[in-house]
Amino acid sequence: KDEQAESHSLKTILSFCHALFSGLAEDVKQWLVEVHQFRIEAVAGSPGLPTPEGMHRDGVDYVLVLLIKRQNIASGTTMIGSLDGSLSSSFTLIEAFDAALVDDARVYHGVTAVEPLIADLPAYRDVLVVTFRKA
């Protein structure tokens, strides 16, 4: 049994996403949902690069990027871009549970590399990414 998959926190996050995204796409009867954990690590002289790198679309309908923890990092700025390639918005997820909700068909999104603030301490950015795609 996978404790994370059965956790109250994850079930709450998925319920929130389901209610929100189903409200935006009332014709959808069933979703394909994926959950991914990402850690971007950085060390002095070697910035932590996001995955995937650069502005992109995930090929799904909706995306939640939920910050779990930032430790000793600078940057990690979330960017939202229009389909024409122009930057529409940028912001930094700072506190645990800060989030970006993305309509993947309408915008590109990405995040900048992270760098350690203090060279000899661990430096990382942990996010939970949840994607919803029409079944």
What is each of the regions a protein language model found here?
Residues 1-34:
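Signature of the catalytic double-stranded beta-helix
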Residues 76-135:
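Catalytic core of Fe(II)/2-oxoglutarate
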Residues 25-95:
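Catalytic core of non-heme Fe(II) oxygenases with the double-stranded beta-helix
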Residues 17-26, 65-68, 97-98, 114-117:
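Intrinsically disordered, low-complexity boundary segments flanking structured domains
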